[in-house]
Amino acid sequence: MAAKEVKFSVEAREKMLRGVDILANAVKVTLGPKGRNVVIDKSFGAPRITKDGVSVAKEIELEDKFENMGAQMVREVASKTSDIAGDGTTTATVLAQAIVKEGAKAVTSGMNPMDLKRGIDLAVSAIVEELKANARKISNNAEIAQVGTISANGDAEIGRFLAEAVQKVGNDGVITVEEAKTAETELEVVEGMQFDRGYLSPYFVTNADKMRVEFEDPYILIHEKKLSNLQSMLPILEAVVQSGKPLLIIAEDVEGEALATLVVNKLRGGLKIAAVKAPGFGDRRKAMLEDIAILTAGTVISEDLGIKLENVTLNMLGRAKKITVEKENTTIIDGVGSKEEISGRIAQIKAQIEETTSDYDREKLQERLAKLAGGVAVIRVGGSTEVEVKEKKDRVDDALHATRAAVEEGILPGGGVALLRAVKALDNIKTANDDQRVGVEIVRRALEAPARQIAENAGAEGSVVVGKLREKSDFSYGWNAQTGEFGDLYAQGVIDPAKVVRTALQDASSIAGLLVTTEAMIAEKPKKDAPPAMPAGAGMDF
């Protein structure tokens, strides 16, 4: 086992603080609408330019092991906030730095670290309740656009795209962000249920110009197994032909004689028909077929349920207003399934999302939920260069998470003002002793840090701005760093999601509390390199 180096009390905290400061100082320059960029060197390709706090934090690794421990703990704050709220990583880092700095001073002056931590925890709980009490529910699309704009560093175009996407697919819908092939940013919305399987034969195409199958008011046969001969299907095919409506077959596969017969019948004009493979694999395929059945009020033809193909009747088939099948996608629009059944299925999937521990499963369940609940929106981010596209995509990702969080828990005034105003909740806290009271005061001072930093990044004097904000008691009165004006931040569209502000504070205080109560640090001793061997014969007389 390698030898370890151990540092105690003041020396340990000094090293740790230096690491915290290096990381936090690099991250906090990105805060606010006038935050600066950070350029990150890549081992290959162009450097990456970003204003995303967590991206900066993840790149920092320090040479000194003890300093690095401090930096990594604060990096954990940014990552945790990013995972839960998707935004607010820079605010969390600034808060953590402020609490650790003040806390370390108090411990060095002889206060009890555990009581300080209790005081910090009491203060944070009071602030969180105050934030929740003052959060406003989002009431219209303009507010969603404002949240998106603020989180995308003042880019109104991104805010507009996000508001449009949320409006079209709802809050349960999936919104994905991709890099565009062009310089323009665009939004594409797929309404209805779409899955990534196309027609099994191009002969099924009804619209030759666009190379796709378009059916109005079709029947849908949902079959779990392969179809290789049509004998057992003849009764249902005849019933569909008599009804005069088109038929879409969704099955594990349609092959050989069955596919050939369907194509021949289609070409001779007697049958409006198309066949596609079922989406997904294994158990997920069963679940997705069940989703399609509920959406279209059909039945999955499955041997598990004891239903044979020859016994299928028209009322077991699904129905929809329109179906489009392309080479690689199938879209079912306006299935006739009952609202209650669809809502029940959505609730079931939401429960599974809560229970699952696998990120992959959660992502797939979210996709299924979106397909049932409303649709999928894709924002394609464009730019002139690859570096610009990547930087913009970072901002769109942040803004997307922020808008989701805003719809979930409501909004608060932005610019660090919500935290500054919530300070009044600390006046009534009862503490057991003076050290706990100091812990509460540490949080009181730390809550100014984000507003101060936003002002400094915008070229103003942080103390002056905070002083002016303190003169007014109105919760939404603040300073707009973009315009340099004081006023009602709700009216000016400077708003933050309550979930982001709350998560940033809770994560920052949690890690900062651990750092303040640290008394010893252990790391491996750096290995001393052995001196190079002397060359043979050097300095020898023969």
UniProtKB/Swiss-Prot annotation:
GO molecular function: ATP binding; ATP-dependent protein folding chaperone; isomerase activity; unfolded protein binding
Location in the cell: Cytoplasm
GO terms (BP aspect): protein refolding
Alphabetical keyword list: ATP-binding, Chaperone, Cytoplasm, Isomerase, Nucleotide-binding, Plasmid
UniProt-listed Pfam families: Cpn60_TCP1 (PF00118)
InterPro entries noted in UniProt: Chaperonin_Cpn60_CS, Cpn60/GroEL, Cpn60/GroEL/TCP-1, GroEL-like_apical_dom_sf, GROEL-like_equatorial_sf, TCP-1-like_intermed_sf
GO cellular component: cytoplasm
Annotated positions binding ATP: 30-33, 51, 87-91, 415, 496
Residue pairs linked by disulfide bridges in the UniProt entry: none
Catalytic activity: ATP + H2O + a folded polypeptide = ADP + phosphate + an unfolded polypeptide
PROSITE patterns in the cross-refs: CHAPERONINS_CPN60
Protein EC: 5.6.1.7
CDD domains referenced in this protein's UniProt entry, alphabetically: GroEL
HAMAP family reported in the protein's UniProt record: CH60
Family of this protein: Belongs to the chaperonin (HSP60) family.
Record's function text: Together with its co-chaperonin GroES, plays an essential role in assisting protein folding. The GroEL-GroES system forms a nano-cage that allows encapsulation of the non-native substrate proteins and provides a physical environment optimized to promote and accelerate protein folding.
Assembly, per entry: Forms a cylinder of 14 subunits composed of two heptameric rings stacked back-to-back. Interacts with the co-chaperonin GroES.
Protein name stated in the entry: Chaperonin GroEL 4
Organism expressing this protein natively: Rhizobium etli (strain ATCC 51251 / DSM 11541 / JCM 21823 / NBRC 15573 / CFN 42)
